Structures are given as structure tokens and as C-alpha cells.
């Protein structure tokens, strides 16, 4: 997409209708940059670029892996990093260097990523101390601080090397949320504007939805005054818009950016105009209400903006026209650390190939599951799966990948190829997990496959929290044949087990013996009836 607007354009919230949780947005020159949480997916720590705060493109994954641990590598049953990994990045640019600070709950470590160019390469190092939901801040005198915590918010000065706390430096509690709050302050960002210090933070006051608060002080060692600045759900089922910060335009206008839980699709970015009241506190949207439509600043970009989702596997070719091995489009991410000997883009030209390298009880433990974000309100994914080299007990197919997963897959049983829909049952609609990672999937429907090579389809419908996926199939050699449904609709429920929106997943796993192979090709991604304001 080419961005060449000369006049402000109006878009619908959420402006990006896909799972970009914990967004942090900054402006450098005329360009906006965003970092977002990627949890257990690799490569991680997505860095995106925009010229208008609405149309975003990937420019880097700042993080290859969090840590080379059995959990991050899915090395054994019961050991995983689901819902943990890379959390809540804080993105900053200061004196020629780019910074991302984040914490990982599985390693209980904070990490600092640095780069000379936001497109990379990025360097990683550990910090002394653990800074939950941290916000990095550089003051006018170049001293660095971090605001962090859950319920109790602290500000700690960092040493000049940014390797840990400054000996004798500022280290203080700035706020303590109401102990009766359903969830205390977290997701904090620290700014300075007109000589005042601003902390944006979110919480769940007792008996209310998620809201955004702002704390203001005249100095970092002074008293912070708190005020609610957003208490609104965009008329969407009580899901509060909160957790984010503020960014200005080159013309001096201000916007607040926040995420909103949107059920199965995940946590999505919203955008709203902002101004400062006479008392200095931000005034968000329309008297604290998030507008359904937002006018964004004019932008001009000479280069096309790359899509944030799509149908291609391969990102680039080499000078000879061949494929650069292991070079996927940036909208693809693997579940956990990859086992590179068991996947390929080159063994079968045009196909993504998976080899079975371990015995797994279910999809949770499959190595190298390749994922892509879904997008609201509806996403359709199609792929052709060649199962001619599966072994008995292998499953290869197309998933609605989340804690309570479901999928359509080809499987081999007693030398015959079957087509099956399986799922992990949803016990309730709460966000809490049952922590059952190991039980086999439940079969919803199963038939004899017409052939070893089948075209599979999944329709992910998030319309008004419908949050259902349905599966279809047809013969891969008969592209004009009608799609035939298989099984029933399955719920896509956002839970804290994965703590991410439902993703498309291409997978292979074995329940009896390793060595099977599955090829995936002619993948197609579409978003029918999607309105502008996202993509």
C-alpha cells in the first residue's frame, strides 16, 4: 500500500484490528515506530513503522530468542513458555541509539535490546534487577530511569551503562493502587512534557472494567497526583480501552494510543486525539470517551507500506533467483524456539515443509508450528496440505491456534489417510487456564480423505465477539469444487494460558513415531468485508 495522503484521513477504531498487545509508540522525525509483545513466538519483539499512525509495516524482529531454555525450546512434555516469554516492550530513541526494554516472566529477567538502526541488527543484554511492565525514560540531562511494577509503582534510576540501578540514585515508590482493586496499576509509560513528568498506567478498579490513569509530578522525586483519564469500552462488551501512552505529530498535535481486549482476536491498538487541560492532565478523545472514528495526520511515503499479514511464505530471494533458506515473510512467527533441522523452504520449491522430530501428545507440544495473526472481524485462511509422506499417528493441518485450540488435519491411521477436526474443549469463557497441556485432542468429526493432498480452509469469525472458527475442505486437484464443511463451529476464547489472540497455525506432530513429512503450499490469507482502519 502506498501512503500519499495530503489531507487528514478518518479511520475506524480499532485502527489495527489484530493482536498487537502492549503497544509502545514513539516518533522520530516524521516517522512513527511501534514495539509490541510477542510472548512465546519467535522471532519476537516486533518493530513496526508507520507514517500516519494507522498503516503499519514490520521492519524488524528485535529479538531472536529470549533464552535458550527447555521451556523456550518445548523440549519435554509439561515444559513450555506459553503466555510468558517477551512481555510489554518499552521503545525509546536517545542520542542515536534505539532501545527496547522488556521483562520475561519465565526467566524472571529484564533485557535491554539496542540498535543503531531500528531495522537492526539488534543486540541483547540482561539487566540487574527485574522490572515488570517497565517504561524506559531518558531525561533532558541524559539520565535514564525506569518506571515499573504491579499495583506498587516504582521509579529507579539506571546507571550510565544501563546495566542496572544507579548506586545511590533515585529509587522510590511513586504510587500505590487501592488494595481492593481487581488489578492494580501496571503497563506504565513515563514521559516529560512542558517540564512535568507523566506516567500513563492502567488498572481494574474494584467492580469496574479496565481504565487508564495518569500520574503527574513536577519532579521525579516529588509527589505524583493521579487521575482517571479513560473509562470507556468503545461500546464493546465492557472491554475497557487502556494500557498505552501518548505521541505527538510533527505539527504538534497529540494522540493517545491504547490497546483493547477484543475477545478471541486478542488485544488490539486504538487511537484517539489528545490535548492537555489547563491543569496539565491529558484530555482524551471526547471527554474521556474513545471516538469510534479518528482523524489521523497527513502523511507522505514514497515507498509502498508492506502488509502486516499475507499469503506468501518467502521474504526474499538471493542474487541467483533462488530462495534464501529460513527467510520467511515477517508476518510469520514460530511457536517457541525453532528446531531448524525440521523445517525448510527449499526442499520442495514453493512449499513450507515440516519434518516430525519428536513424539507429542497434542498440538501444544508440536515443534515448529508456523503462525500468523488473525484479523477482525473475519479472517479466512486456506492451504494445500500434502500428507503423502505422513506416518501412522501423524497429524498435519490448519489450526485455530490458542490454548483451547481446534484444527482440521490430515492424519494417517493403519495406512489410510483420514481427514479430521479435533479440539481442546473450552471449559468456560473466563480468561483463566486449566493448565492442561498434555491431554490428547478430542475428535469432533472424521472421514476418509479423498486423496493424500487436500485443500483446507478455516474461517475465523470475531464479529461482535462471536469468536467461532469453522473448517472446510475440498480436493486439491479440483479447485472449482465446492467447499465442504467438516465438524461443528469451535469457540476461540482468549485465555491467559497463551495470553495472545487466536492465530492461524500450520503444524505437524507425531503420536507414534518420528520421521513423517508434511508440505504446505498455496497458502491464502484474506479478510472479507474488513473496513479500513487496520488493513
Residue positions per predicted region:
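Carbohydrate-active catalytic/glycan-binding domains of CAZyme proteins
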Residues: 1-535
Amino acid at each position: 500500500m502506498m501512503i500519499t495522503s495530503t489531507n487528514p484521513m478518518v479511520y475506524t477504531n480499532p485502527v489495527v484490528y489484530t493482536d498487537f498487545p502492549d503497544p509502545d509508540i514513539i516518533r522520530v522525525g516524521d516517522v512513527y515506530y511501534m514495539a509490541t509483545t510477542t510472548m512465546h513466538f519467535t522471532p519476537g519483539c516486533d518493530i513496526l513503522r508507520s507514517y500516519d499512525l494507522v498503516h503499519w509495516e514490520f521492519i524488524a524482529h528485535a529479538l531472536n530468542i529470549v533464552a535458550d531454555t527447555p521451556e523456550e525450546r518445548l523440549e519435554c512434555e509439561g515444559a513450555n513458555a506459553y503466555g510468558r516469554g517477551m512481555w510489554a516492550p518499552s521503545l525509546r530513541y536517545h542520542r542515536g541509539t534505539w532501545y527496547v526494554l522488556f521483562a520475561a516472566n519465565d526467566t524472571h529477567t529484564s533485557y535491554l535490546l539496542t540498535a543503531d538502526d531500528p531495522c537492526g541488527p539488534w543486540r541483547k543484554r540482561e539487566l540487574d534487577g527485574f522490572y515488570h511492565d517497565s517504561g524506559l525514560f531518558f531525561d533532558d540531562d541524559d539520565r535514564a530511569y525506569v518506571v515499573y511494577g504491579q499495583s506498587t509503582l516504582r521509579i529507579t534510576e539506571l546507571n550510565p551503562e544501563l546495566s542496572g540501578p544507579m548506586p545511590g540514585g533515585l529509587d522510590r515508590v511513586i504510587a500505590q493502587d487501592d488494595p481492593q482493586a481487581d488489578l492494580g496499576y501496571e503497563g506504565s509509560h513515563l514521559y516529560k512534557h512542558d517540564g512535568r513528568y507523566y506516567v500513563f498506567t492502567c488498572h481494574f478498579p474494584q467492580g469496574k472494567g479496565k481504565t487508564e490513569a495518569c500520574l503527574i509530578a513536577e519532579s521525579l522525586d516529588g509527589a505524583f497526583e493521579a487521575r482517571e483519564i479513560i473509562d470507556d469500552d468503545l461500546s464493546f462488551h465492557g472491554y475497557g480501552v487502556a494500557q498505552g501512552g501518548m505521541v505527538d505529530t510533527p505539527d504538534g498535535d497529540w494522540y493517545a494510543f491504547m490497546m483493547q481486549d477484543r475477545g478471541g482476536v486478542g488485544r488490539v491498538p486504538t487511537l484517539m486525539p489528545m490535548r492537555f487541560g489547563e491543569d496539565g492532565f491529558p484530555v482524551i478523545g471526547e471527554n474521556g470517551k474513545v471516538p469510534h472514528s479518528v482523524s489521523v495526520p497527513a502523511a507522505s511515503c514514497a515507498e509502498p507500506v508492506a502488509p502486516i499479514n499475507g499469503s506468501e511464505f518467502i521474504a526474499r530471494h538471493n542474487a541467483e533467483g533462488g530462495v534464501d533458506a529460513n527467510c520467511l515473510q515477517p508476518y510469520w512467527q514460530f511457536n517457541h524456539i525453532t528446531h531448524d533441522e525440521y523445517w525448510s523452504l527449499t526442499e520442495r520449491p514453493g512449499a513450507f515443509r515440516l519434518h516430525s522430530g519428536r513424539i507429542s501428545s497434542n498440538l501444544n507440544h508440536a515443534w515448529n508450528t508456523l503462525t500468523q495473526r488473525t484479523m477482525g472481524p473475519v479472517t479466512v485462511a486456506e492451504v494445500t496440505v500434502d500428507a503423502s509422506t505422513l506416518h501412522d499417528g501423524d497429524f498435519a493441518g490448519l489450526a485455530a491456534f490458542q490454548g483451547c485450540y481446534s484444527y482440521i488435519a490430515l492424519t494417517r491411521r493403519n495406512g489410510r489417510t483420514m481427514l479430521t477436526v479435533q479440539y481442546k474443549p473450552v471449559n468456560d469463557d473466563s480468561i483463566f487456564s486449566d493448565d492442561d497441556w498434555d491431554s490428547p485432542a478430542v475428535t469432533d468429526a472424521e472421514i476418509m480423505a479423498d486423496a493424500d493432498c487436500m485443500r483446507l480452509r478455516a474461517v475465523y469469525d470475531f464479529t461482535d465477539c462471536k469468536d467461532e472458527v469453522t473448517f472446510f475442505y475440498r480436493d486439491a486437484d479440483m479447485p472449482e469444487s465446492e467447499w465442504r464443511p467438516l465438524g461443528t463451529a469451535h469457540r476461540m476464547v482468549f485465555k491467559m494460558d497463551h495470553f495472545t489472540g487466536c492465530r492461524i497455525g500450520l503444524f505437524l506432530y507425531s503420536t507414534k513415531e518420528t520421521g513423517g513429512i508434511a508440505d504446505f503450499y498455496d497458502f491464502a490469507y484474506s479478510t472479507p468485508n474488513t473496513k479500513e482502519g487496520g488493513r
